[in-house]
Amino acid sequence: MVKETQYYDILGVKPSASPEEIKKAYRKLALKYHPDKNPDEGEKFKLISQAYEVLSDPKKRDIYDQGGEQAIKEGGSGSPSFSSPMDIFDMFFGGGGRMTRERRGKNVVHQLSVTLEDLYNGITKKLALQKNVICEKCEGIGGKKGSVEKCPLCKGRGMQVHIQQIGPGMVQQIQTVCIECKGQGERINPKDRCENCSGAKVTREKKIIEVHVEKGMKDGQKILFHGEGDQEPELDPGDVIIVLDQKDHSVFQRRGQDLIMKMKIQLSEALCGFKKTIKTLDDRVLVISSKSGEVIKHGDLKCIRNEGMPIYKAPLEKGVMIIQFLVVFPEKQWLSQEKLPQLEALLPPRQKVRITDDMDQVELKEFNPNEQSWRQHREAYEEDDEEPRAGVQCQTA
């Protein structure tokens, strides 16, 4: 049981969330609250990054679960600092850290919503993007030739350094973006600024790109368009990174290259046999049936070879389709008392129990999970969902 849930709440996941669920939550929130899209949500973006940095690291997550945020700040092992939110974002989306990008423009990251059918069959989607391009009129100078001068306030560094007192005899040095040149290190007299870009050196341009989603690609996979990102003077253009975001499917769940589904069958079908149909992601219909005399138990797993997801870059090969059977039992009093002996005669015999005088006779009651006494202890006794675990294999015979 975790001590506190603040970091989990920030990412919108449960304390029992898997590493994949944590990654997916960070991806969606980081793209939504990135300063380029939400300039006023810098603090929110920072909190999202801190939560992900802790929960994505097994050791830090264990420290947090046991001691909360205070244990993280104390370091657990002596390291109280967090990484830069932008570095976490860049490393997650494949852009590298700041030092690796210093001679290139910013990468542009976009999320593309796809269905499980899209990832199964492959699809080409057109995406309209806005990007910065070098101003054609001033050729990226920002104004008339010779009008650009070094910023007198920051001396061309683009940053200002302030000394702040934080206690008696204690000061700290704070570095901020220069308010005069907005971090550019230079300025242009307003009357000399380019009319086309207003001195910004770049203009916004709409570009349509075709995104080829190949068979077998997965949720969160990145598609790179090299050099199609924002342009900046004297820098190579950055990349456009498209991140695939798979919508939930009404029937199938994907686990690696396998497809998992749940199928309800009646008790009569579980005992006497069944014949069912399954519609695949490419609109074929599969017919499945149980063998004569075979009993299907609640929760049993069966699989169909070569009906899972196509293997990326080898689409003729596929994983398996795993079916979990859920046996639906009859409602109360579905059979009259007179017919119960007939049914019992057809079923395996009951297990005989020897009752002695020192045993306590108790009465079974209907259970209500919403009762107060249950809710207080529910977290301690949470049970796993009825889902098959990884490692299920089809038998060869």
Curated annotation (Swiss-Prot):
Membrane topology: Lipid-anchor
CDD domains referenced in this protein's UniProt entry, alphabetically: DnaJ, DnaJ_C, DnaJ_zf
Listed Basic and acidic residues bias regions: 366-380
Tissues and organs where the protein is expressed, per its UniProt entry: Specifically expressed in testis and heart.
Residue ranges occupied by any J domain in the UniProt entry: 4-70
Zinc finger extent (CR-type): 122-206
Cited SUPFAM superfamilies: Chaperone J-domain, DnaJ/Hsp40 cysteine-rich domain, HSP40/DnaJ peptide-binding domain
Chain residues that bind Zn(2+) 2: 151, 154, 178, 181
Residue numbers spanned by region Disordered: 366-397
PTM annotation (Phosphoserine): residues: 18
PANTHER family associated with the record: DNAJ-LIKE-2, ISOFORM A-RELATED
Name assigned to this protein: DnaJ homolog subfamily A member 4
Source organism (scientific name): Mus musculus (Mouse)
Gene that specifies this protein: Dnaja4
